Design a protein with these regions (language model features):
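Acidic, polar low-complexity intrinsically disordered regions
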Residues: 5-155, 165-166
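Helix-rich interaction surfaces within compact, conserved domain-sized segments
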Residues: 144-187
């Protein structure tokens, strides 16, 4: 009787992480979240921004990319869309920023503000891509103009938190973080 144990192939995430020469914990965490965004949530145009590549405040890697649908709509923007009968699925999708973190990692307002300070202005994240502005309705053209001039809300990013306890289970939870505070809605 042979006691041959079949070899278990490494997961796609493990293979991605081990493809780096000397992966640091931050690199491994960032790649795990990048893999989750690409394969679980179908984000495109993903890019890792190495520490300090955006500013001196950016001490950790950040991820940017395009989600398949709008992640967050500011209450004032939502009111504008409703008032002008613009369907949310017709709105161009902004590039979004992701802050990789693990469960239990210590965060302060100063650290989070430093990350937000390193992000580009929201007007730079508007991606029109294949959107044909000339064919759009007047309301949609006005919406795009307003969004380019002064976007609703300040800078924002998704805080991607990985469950790292006991080796983790691959779960990633995303929290929307924003610069400043949105004003309360008026009913």
């Amino acid at each position: 009787m042979s006691s041959h144990t079949p070899e278990i192939a490494p997961s796609a995430v493990s293979s991605l992480i081990s493809s780096k020469l000397h992966p640091t914990p931050n690199t491994a965490l960032t790649l795990e979240i990048l893999h989750n965004l690409e394969h679980q949530h179908q984000w495109t145009a993903l890019k890792v921004h190495e520490p300090f590549s955006l500013s001196a405040e950016q001490a950790i890697p950040l991820i940017s990319g395009t989600p398949p649908q709008v992640v967050y709509t500011h209450p004032d923007e939502q009111a504008y869309l409703l008032e002008h009968h613009i369907r949310p699925e017709d709105v161009p999708i902004d590039r979004e920023w992701v802050i990789p973190t693990s469960q239990g990692e210590k965060w302060t307002l100063r650290r989070l503000a430093g990350i937000h300070d390193s992000l580009p202005k929201r007007t730079e994240d508007l991606q029109l891509g294949s959107f044909d502005l000339e064919q759009a309705s007047k309301d949609m053209q006005e919406y795009i103009r307003l969004k380019k001039e002064k976007p609703w809300g300040g800078k924002r990013a998704l805080l991607a938190m990985v469950n790292s306890g006991l080796g983790g289970d691959g779960t990633v939870v995303y929290y929307v973080t924003m610069e400043g505070t949105p004003k309360p809605r008026q009913n």
